A protein has these predicted regions:
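Short, well-ordered alpha-helix to beta-strand connector turns
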Residues: 59, 82, 191-193, 238-240, ...
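Cofactor-binding loop segments of dinucleotide-utilizing enzymes, especially the Rossmann-like FAD-
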Residues: 12-14, 90, 281
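Hydrophobic beta-strand segments of well-ordered beta-sheets in folded domains
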Residues: 5-9, 85, 240-243
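Flexible, charged surface loops at secondary-structure boundaries
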Residues: 1-3, 54-58, 129, 172, ...
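ATP/nucleoside-binding phosphotransfer catalytic cores, i.e., glycine-rich phosphate-binding loops
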Residues: 209-285
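ATP/NTP phosphate-donor binding region
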Residues: 1-65, 72, 76, 80, ...
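Short His-Asn-centered micro-motif
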Residues: 65-66, 88
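Catalytic core of DAGKc-family lipid kinases
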Residues: 10, 40, 80-204
């Protein structure tokens, strides 16, 4: 199956698993399965490819070995393309890879499935807002300030970690909360953090409310590792459409597949199908 498909590879040296050793191991694993890479895109030094460029080069498959944020950008850039995208776990949490291939599935096993032809093109539902779409998930509210701690950790900036952790703790405890307005659900005085997880059954929505400093720190640690549900949370529902509003008419901070954006004081969230085929090797969600 693999040898006849012209493939390009997208990598990002800033992603969690994109060390030189990891990239060498990836190329070796691809070669062992006769999957030939015609060109490697080193994002962000190289621009992400678009459908016109890929079609002109005869590319039928793009393999993406990055974190969820770069994956989001790459898949968005390929909207409308008639080829296929293979997602590999090249980041820290690799939530989209989990969705497509299963929890804890290594790159080599995914490539084995591809080589065997044990794949299916799918167009999973995304969670959408005015600033973008999320295939892995959205976080909404002042608690998203913990992303600055994560970035400082990525840069090994210990001073930045300490400073941003203090700011994130303050934002989580005193920042303007957000609440589910349409439909009305949950606490009227809102949540420091709401998580939106897209699936083929719509958007799963969970809210987090701290009961003390220990809960705030627990949730911050969970957020840093992109494991929201390890912190204290409550299920608010499953929706195809909803509106989240600020409790004090302040702009709403969001993380879209881990990347920060700012919305207005009220924001609509809907679902839509991905606009390019992704290769799945597991039943997913």
């Amino acid at each position: 199956m693999s040898t006849s498909i012209t493939s390009w590879l997208i990598v990002n040296a800033r992603s969690g698993s994109n060390s030189d050793a990891a990239l060498q191991a990836l190329h070796a694993a691809l070669a062992e399965r006769d999957i030939t890479i015609e060109r490697q895109i080193d994002f962000p030094a190289d621009p992400l490819p678009d459908p016109t460029q890929l079609d002109a080069a005869g590319v039928k498959r793009v393999i993406v070995f990055t974190g969820d944020g770069t994956l989001n950008a790459a898949i968005t850039a390929l909207a409308g393309w008639q080829g296929q995208v293979l997602v590999l776990p090249g980041g820290t949490m690799n939530l989209l890879s989990v969705r497509l291939h299963g929890e804890g599935i290594a790159t080599e096993e995914i490539l084995d499935r591809v080589a065997y032809g044990a794949v299916k093109p799918v167009r999973p539902l995304m969670a959408c807002c005015e600033k973008g779409v999320a295939l892995a998930g959205l976080l909404v509210g002042p608690g998203t300030a913990w992303v600055n701690v994560r970035e400082a950790m990525r840069e090994y900036d210990l001073v930045g970690v300490a400073q941003n952790a203090g700011a994130a703790l303050s934002q989580t405890t005193t920042g303007t909360r957000v609440r589910l307005a349409e439909p009305t659900r949950g606490h009227a005085d809102g949540y420091p953090l709401i998580e939106i997880t897209p699936s083929d059954r719509g958007m799963q929505v969970d809210g987090y409310r701290p009961n003390g400093a220990g809960d705030v720190l627990q949730q911050g640690w969970a957020l840093l590792r992109r494991r929201f549900r390890e912190g204290p949370n409550e299920r608010l529902g499953m929706f195809d459409r909803m509106v989240i509003e600020s409790c004090a008419d302040d702009p709403i901070q969001v993380l879209i597949d881990g990347e920060p954006e700012t919305l207005g004081t009220s924001a609509e969230f809907t679902v839509a199908a991905c606009e390019v085929d992704l290769l799945a090797t597991d039943h997913g969600f």
